[in-house]
Swiss-Prot record:
Location (main, coarse): cytoplasm
Lineage of the organism: Bacteria, Bacillati, Actinomycetota, Actinomycetes, Kitasatosporales
Complex formation: Homodimer. Interacts with FtsZ.
Top-level taxon of the source organism: Bacteria
Native source organism of the sequence: Streptomyces avermitilis (strain ATCC 31267 / DSM 46492 / JCM 5070 / NBRC 14893 / NCIMB 12804 / NRRL 8165 / MA-4680)
Keywords: Cell cycle, Cell division, Cytoplasm, Septation
Protein name in the entry: Cell division protein SepF 1
Cell compartments where the protein resides: Cytoplasm
Family per record: Belongs to the SepF family.
Gene Ontology biological process terms from the UniProt entry: division septum assembly; FtsZ-dependent cytokinesis
């Protein structure tokens, strides 16, 4: 389906609108560049404005969380359908990944967390719910 979600876990900007907004901390020209360094073309930058929703039910799914975040893609981690012990293990694992990557973790709702790669700012979360970083 062209223009729609890539898979059942991808979310479009329209679906995300009104919940929170993920934006880069600085513009692409804000940092000094090394000699010969090329900036990302604007079209590719816009394509990176997506995030992935991962509904984790078993601990083995935690690897998807880490791999997605390591690729620089924000993850909306939904643990609402996981058993309590599995949810605790996945959250503990995800917290370690976030810490290791110097990323951010924001609580969106009970058992729902937004994991953001380094250099990402989250706007629009309810005050007192989001905790920038770990």
């Amino acid at each position: 389906m062209r223009g729609g979600p890539v898979n059942s876990h991808d979310v479009t900007d329209e679906q995300w609108e009104g919940l929170a907004q993920v934006v880069p901390l600085r513009g692409r020209d804000a940092w000094p560049s090394a000699v010969g360094h090329r900036s990302i073309p604007e079209a590719q930058t816009e394509a990176r404005r997506r995030f992935v929703v991962l509904r984790v039910n078993i601990f083995a799914d935690a690897r998807d969380v880490a791999e997605t975040l390591m690729r620089g893609i924000p993850v909306l981690l939904d643990l609402t359908s996981a058993e309590t012990e599995v949810a605790k293990r996945v959250l503990d694992f995800s917290t370690g990944v976030v810490f290791g990557l110097a990323s951010g973790m924001h609580r969106v709702d009970r058992n729902v967390f937004l994991l953001t790669p380094p250099g990402t700012e989250v706007q629009g979360l309810m005050e007192g719910v989001g905790v920038p970083g770990i």
